């Protein structure tokens, strides 16, 4: 696979280099990730995640896999939904992000299983989870098609995948959004996190991520049925939903 090329932001790199470069970004931003999310989105990321949690049809005792769960926002919500008899796994490929997420949950008295896991090679059995979620993580994966197939594999028949991700903003707002993404965002990263370069990558990675219809087709290709999406904040983010029958 070493000869294959892929995108790292706007740069073209070897596929076997991307994971390491993405890891460097998230090792760098982990400690400031939550405050930067609040600043960058003016708190809207909390609204997007709240909507995602309320979209899921979960009951007490269900099993949930939170992929690229980072600092644990969705895992916390899932745990409240499924109760003590349920099972929620917080996973991330980045040890720094996973440590921050685990510690945050522990500080809130919430003990959940955590796993340092690659979404393209999930360490879970077939047909195990009622719900799989991935928020703001799919765009950083090298082989998104492989990751989606793994998510399909670990879901029970009747289970649901929820993908919350930055997407294609409505066209009249593109100019203002570009100014924000490529001028203001790196400046905020420099000021708050002392790291403009990582936030430049984040802006670029959003632009390189598949748009709403393309991701919908990718989920269908991975085997999901009843795939649909809901735009939020004029398409800045979209929540995709697919079911395994």
UniProtKB/Swiss-Prot annotation:
UniProt pathway annotation: Quinol/quinone metabolism; menaquinone biosynthesis; menaquinol from 1,4-dihydroxy-2-naphthoate: step 2/2; Cofactor biosynthesis; ubiquinone biosynthesis
Entry EC no(s): 2.1.1.163, 2.1.1.201
UniProt binding sites for S-adenosyl-L-methionine: 71, 92, 118-119
Pfam families: Ubie_methyltran (PF01209)
The reaction(s) this protein catalyses: a 2-demethylmenaquinol + S-adenosyl-L-methionine = a menaquinol + S-adenosyl-L-homocysteine + H(+); a 2-methoxy-6-(all-trans-polyprenyl)benzene-1,4-diol + S-adenosyl-L-methionine = a 5-methoxy-2-methyl-3-(all-trans-polyprenyl)benzene-1,4-diol + S-adenosyl-L-homocysteine + H(+)
Keywords in alphabetical order: Menaquinone biosynthesis, Methyltransferase, S-adenosyl-L-methionine, Transferase, Ubiquinone biosynthesis
SUPFAM superfamilies, sorted: S-adenosyl-L-methionine-dependent methyltransferases
Keyword Iron-sulfur attached: no
GO biological process, one term: aerobic respiration
Cited InterPro entries: SAM-dependent_MTases_sf (IPR029063), UbiE/COQ5_MeTrFase (IPR004033), UbiE/COQ5_MeTrFase_CS (IPR023576)
Example GO molecular function: 2-methoxy-6-polyprenyl-1,4-benzoquinol methyltransferase activity
Top class in the EC scheme: transferase
Xref: PANTHER family: 2-METHOXY-6-POLYPRENYL-1,4-BENZOQUINOL METHYLASE, MITOCHONDRIAL, METHYLTRANSFERASE
Function field: Methyltransferase required for the conversion of demethylmenaquinol (DMKH2) to menaquinol (MKH2) and the conversion of 2-polyprenyl-6-methoxy-1,4-benzoquinol (DDMQH2) to 2-polyprenyl-3-methyl-6-methoxy-1,4-benzoquinol (DMQH2).
NCBIfam families, sorted: MenG_MenH_UbiE, PRK00216.1-1, PRK00216.1-5
Family: Belongs to the class I-like SAM-binding methyltransferase superfamily. MenG/UbiE family.
Protein name, entry field: Ubiquinone/menaquinone biosynthesis C-methyltransferase UbiE
